[in-house]
Amino acid sequence: MARKPLIAGNWKMNLNHFEAIALVQKIAFSLPDKYFDKVDVTVIPPFTDLRSVQTLVDGDKLRLSYGAQDVSQHDSGAYTGEISGAFLAKLGCSFAVVGHSERRTYHHEDDALVAAKAAAAFRHGITPIVCIGEHLKVREAGNHVEHNVEQLRGSLAGLTSEQIGQAVIAYEPVWAIGTGRVAGAADAQEVCKAIRDELGKLSSPQLAAGIRVLYGGSVNAKNVGEIVAQEDVDGALVGGASLDGEQFATLSAIAAGGPLP
């Protein structure tokens, strides 16, 4: 089954809402419309930028989408500081990242919470981008495949086969995030194939064949082509490079099958 690549730009805690408008305009200006037929492009700004991005995307009828960096497992109530999927849906979010390694590390989120957040996203018509990945010690011990498969199971626990079939999975080796170190294309393929094989067991081989599996970890315009050329890698969760409008547009074009003219 042909899977349309997805390039998702995770801005993390960067850019205020004025800067967000400028960056989205830069991406839209730099990426010719023809590429959107071959690649889905989404930006993942901070919560405080979402309304400004929504207004720009809707007003200018831009073909890129946007999403949130997190979502609460709760729909409403006395949960100070939490952001409901209902709110994100009203803002037009297509995606919500759940289980990012920085959330797991700094906020001690475990697989059960990630699964609950993924379920909450689905309740509100939002596609979760479920992140998994190993630390360097796990990689060096040669247990990276088993680690990621186990984390995948836990992070999707309780979801239906149909929901799993609609999710996006992002493999992000923790040792490669923001470090400049990148998993080799063959390494990314090894884990992403194992992920897809496990998805086939958790849902069905037919559904798994259509699930997009992304790679995340120091992706840029120089390495994205080799990474997304792998059979089981369907795009990238991009960090620092997504803050550069021209570079993000270029790597999106490369993922679509051709460099910018």
From Swiss-Prot:
The active site is at H100 (electrophile), E172 (proton acceptor). CDD domains: TIM. GO terms for cellular component: cytosol. It is an enzyme of class 5 (isomerase). It catalyses: D-glyceraldehyde 3-phosphate = dihydroxyacetone phosphate. Substrate binds at N10, W11, K12, G178, S218, G239, G240. It is found in: Cytoplasm. Involved in the gluconeogenesis. Catalyzes stereospecifically the conversion of dihydroxyacetone phosphate (DHAP) to D-glyceraldehyde-3-phosphate (G3P). This is Triosephosphate isomerase. It comes from Mycobacterium sp. (strain KMS). The gene is tpiA.
